[in-house]
Every structure is written in structure tokens, then in C-alpha cells.
Amino acid sequence: MPELPEVEVTRLGLVPHLTGRRIVRAVVRHHGLRWPVDPALPELLGGRTVARVLRRGKYLLIECVPDIAHGPQAGAGWLLVHLGMTGTLRVLETPAAPGTHDHLDIELADAAGRPITLRYRDPRRFGAVLWHDGDEAALSAHPLLRNLGIEPFDTRFDGDWMYARTRGRSAAIKTVLLAGDIVVGVGNIYCSESLFRAGIRPTTAAGRISRPRYAALAEAIRATLADAIARGGSTLRDFVGSDGQSGYFQLDALVYDRAGLPCRVCGTPIRQIVQGQRSTFYCPACQR
């Protein structure tokens, strides 16, 4: 599943291609994603201009502003995209016939009329493409966004933030991080990696971790995610960036998917356990 780094890599790739371009038309081939695609989406998008491409957690947020043809009452709207398990957004600068799993095309043009196509592909159809009317404040109240935790690169996110929000919590720290209500985007791969960097065993009760150890964990989360973004994310199955390139963070993973292999720090064999139906990897010597 694409996690925060993969979504951010996609966003960074889309920004120079989409920002300021006018949407010529949208073609929906399959409406049956995780939630049905609005049948009116082509009409809602046509003629609008992409103002910004943002990210909140694992959601891509594409702001589409109206032109005069939409009438004086028309306001900004947002395209919310979640990549699900196997979704990708590709920018096509030359025409290409759609494949079986290419569910949505958004055709855009710049001021000179040069066309590009934004194509959404999702073999398993667990992703989502939703429309939301309103400004950014209204968007933040969307049911899918309003309960998300803080962004890991927000300056307010630190050890004190995590310590204060985990008092009395008996659940394992990895389970708490994956829930996303304290900090967003620390998915399964990067959770194992961050906990290793911080020297914290993933089964440790969140409420028993000290303030200094949370400071180390907050820094490890930021560093791990930043490294992953710089390496184009992780490609475990289907993920590619908007340019079609695979990520390679997983090639240098410290613990993830390395069960039985020697720890890169101390040489102890990496262990694998299951937490909440997800595989967890850790070093029993380095993580306490």
C-alpha cells in the first residue's frame, strides 16, 4: 500500500505538471472504486484550473478553481485521491491507449494549449477519487480528514507531543502509530524502520515510553520519512511515481522484510512477528 512517502513523491511529481493548467475534460471508465466515483465528476471538473496540489496524510488534495463560465456562485472545489493498495497517478505527455485498470483520465492544457493527461490506474480498485466543494477550511472538516493526526513534518510534532498523547495507553507503540490519530503517515514499513532507529521495541506499551525516548522516536520518524521521500518511496508491488519510476528505499531497509538476516548494526538475526494482522520486523538486541 502506498504510504506517506509514496504519496508525497507522487505529489511532488504532479505539482509542476498540473499547477496552472486548465482541465479540458475528464473521462471516467469505471465508477466502482472504494467509494463510487460521482457520475457528475466530468461536468464538475471541466473548465476548471488546477491551483494547488497538496497532501494530507495519504490523501492527495487537488484544488480546482472555476472560471467565469461556471457562473458567479461557483466556488473552489477539491479532488480527493487515495491510492488504496495499488493505485497510481501518472502524467502522460504523449497519448497512450488506456489499459484494463486505467479508470480515470483528466486531460489538461497549458496557456498555449499543449495537452497532458493525468491517468489514475488501480488494479484492485481499493483507492478513491472524490469531489468536495468548498475552501480549504471546509475541506479540513471532511469526514475522511478531520480526525487525522498531526503531519510528521509539522514543527509542533516532537517528543512532547507524542508523550502527552500516549499517557495511560496500554496498546503497543506500533499499533498506536499505525492508528494515525497521533501522527499521520507512519505506515507499516516506516513504522518498523522508525522504531528501529529509535531503539524501541514495537511491542512496548505506548504509555510506558519515556519523554526522552519519544523525542528520539519523533526524530526517527521524520528522518525515516525524509529518507524515503528522497529515495522515491518504496516499491514492493505496484507503486511507481507520477513519472513511472519505482522507488528504492526498501533496498536499504534496516529491518523491514529482513527476517532472519543479520542486523545491520549488531549482527543479531532480525525477528518477525504479527501485530494487528501486519508483519513487524525488529532487532531483539538493538530495540528494548
From Swiss-Prot:
It catalyses: Hydrolysis of DNA containing ring-opened 7-methylguanine residues, releasing 2,6-diamino-4-hydroxy-5-(N-methyl)formamidopyrimidine; 2'-deoxyribonucleotide-(2'-deoxyribose 5'-phosphate)-2'-deoxyribonucleotide-DNA = a 3'-end 2'-deoxyribonucleotide-(2,3-dehydro-2,3-deoxyribose 5'-phosphate)-DNA + a 5'-end 5'-phospho-2'-deoxyribonucleoside-DNA + H(+). Binds 1 zinc ion per subunit. Its EC number is 3.2.2.23, 4.2.99.18. DNA binds at residues 101, 124, 169. It holds the Pfam family H2TH. InterPro entries: DNA_glyclase/AP_lyase_DNA-bd, DNA_glyclase_Znf_dom_DNA_BS, Formamido-pyr_DNA_Glyclase, FPG_cat, MutM-like_N-ter, Ribosomal_uS13-like_H2TH, Znf_DNA_glyclase/AP_lyase, Znf_FPG/IleRS. Involved in base excision repair of DNA damaged by oxidation or by mutagenic agents. Acts as a DNA glycosylase that recognizes and removes damaged bases. Has a preference for oxidized purines, such as 7,8-dihydro-8-oxoguanine (8-oxoG). Has AP (apurinic/apyrimidinic) lyase activity and introduces nicks in the DNA strand. Cleaves the DNA backbone by beta-delta elimination to generate a single-strand break at the site of the removed base with both 3'- and 5'-phosphates. This is Formamidopyrimidine-DNA glycosylase. GO terms for biological process: base-excision repair. Monomer. A zinc finger (FPG-type) spans 254-288. SUPFAM superfamilies: Glucocorticoid receptor-like (DNA-binding domain), N-terminal domain of MutM-like DNA repair proteins, S13-like H2TH domain.
